[in-house]
Amino acid sequence: MGFQKFSPFLALSILVLLQAGSLHAAPFRSALESSPADPATLSEDEARLLLAALVQDYVQMKASELEQEQEREGSRIIAQKRACDTATCVTHRLAGLLSRSGGVVKNNFVPTNVGSKAFGRRRRDLQA
């Protein structure tokens, strides 16, 4: 008995599904009315060309802005040395500091009796 009540519903649902499958949504505009700039109507090659043109225009715009900025700054650009933290660079910086300070550093230090001449003179003085 349940099958008799179920069969009209099954037949009706099959007909509805068949009709729904055969219906297709119509486009809002025809292909002739659509603009060529619409991304849905562009082919893959056209989209690549459009993207390349946009990128090229952007790069040219940024390059011209950079040139204008450099012209405005002009002589304000100052060359700076790289920072270096190796032992050689630190030694050079300390040597420069000592040479710039001049006699101030020499007065603060007690002279030592070291060097190539100091040891040689002692030996000669002892032998003589």
Swiss-Prot record:
Keyword Lipid biosynthesis listed: no
GO cellular component entries: cytoplasm; extracellular region; extracellular space
Keywords assigned: Amidation, Cleavage on pair of basic residues, Disulfide bond, Hormone, Secreted, Signal
GO BP annotation list: activation of adenylate cyclase activity; adenylate cyclase-activating G protein-coupled receptor signaling pathway; amylin receptor 1 signaling pathway; calcitonin gene-related peptide receptor signaling pathway; cell-cell signaling; endothelial cell migration; endothelial cell proliferation; G protein-coupled receptor internalization
Tissue expression remark: Expressed in spinal cord.
Coiled-coil annotated spans: none
Secretion signal, residue range per the UniProt entry: 1-25
Disulphide bridges, residue numbers: 84-89
Gene3D superfamilies: 6.10.250.2190
PANTHER family the record matches: CALCITONIN GENE-RELATED PEPTIDE 2 (PTHR10505:SF3), CALCITONIN-RELATED (PTHR10505)
Extra remark: The CALCA gene (HGNC:1437) encodes a small family of peptides including calcitonin (UniProtKB:P01258), its C-terminal flanking peptide katacalcin (UniProtKB:P01258) and the calcitonin gene-related peptide 1/CGRP1 (UniProtKB:P06881).
Function description: CGRP1/CALCA is a peptide hormone that induces vasodilation mediated by the CALCRL-RAMP1 receptor complex. Dilates a variety of vessels including the coronary, cerebral and systemic vasculature. Its abundance in the CNS also points toward a neurotransmitter or neuromodulator role. It also elevates platelet cAMP. CGRP1 can also bind and activate CALCR-RAMP1 (AMYR1) receptor complex.
Official protein name in the record: Calcitonin gene-related peptide 1
This protein's encoding gene: CALCA
